[in-house]
Amino acid sequence: MLCEGLARAVPQPVRALPPPPPTTLQPQERRKLLSSFPRSTPKGRRDHAIALCLCELALRSDEVVGLTIDDLDWRAMTVRLGQTKQRRQRLLPLPDSVARTIMNYLKRGRPPTRSRALFVGHLAPYDGPLTASYVRVVIRRAFARCGMKPMGTHVLRHSWATWAHRRGSGLKLIADVLGHRSLESTQRYAHVNVEELRRVALPWPRTIR
């Protein structure tokens, strides 16, 4: 009795709860979102290319608008993301689907301008890059067209990381693509994988007596 009383009197350490798993899209939702962009207009081709950069390269909205034509290496099929005070420089492979979409935009969508920004406005004078807030509006409108709950660009980045981990990509590789300086920021995608396994796990069979 005395031991039990002492045990109750000893303060227990507070256990930090794991962060909630990030919201992600299912593959069919991602396809529906991308197919919602009208590719028959120059502006639609630009916005479709922006959406693919978010989905396939897992870029942040400010990284998308920061891209320049000089960041694309068509021979090596890579895209370079410049270094900032908070982020280190990254070199990412350029998937064929993204390369074709960007090339289609450059040939049939991007207005003539001296700006080196990859994505520019479609109202004169065409000499400035888009803003990150505009990119977020583009994606929220796409969700609305699909009849889905409007979400920010971060859900596309989270979806890429989650599905990359489920396909067997290591956390170090995912961290390199996302530009995380520490693996601690990437651990949450491993937690998502565990939760998915828990959800689909079969119940333990009952013992027949």
Regions found by a protein language model. Give the residues of each.
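Conserved catalytic core of the tyrosine transesterase superfamily
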Residues: 1-209
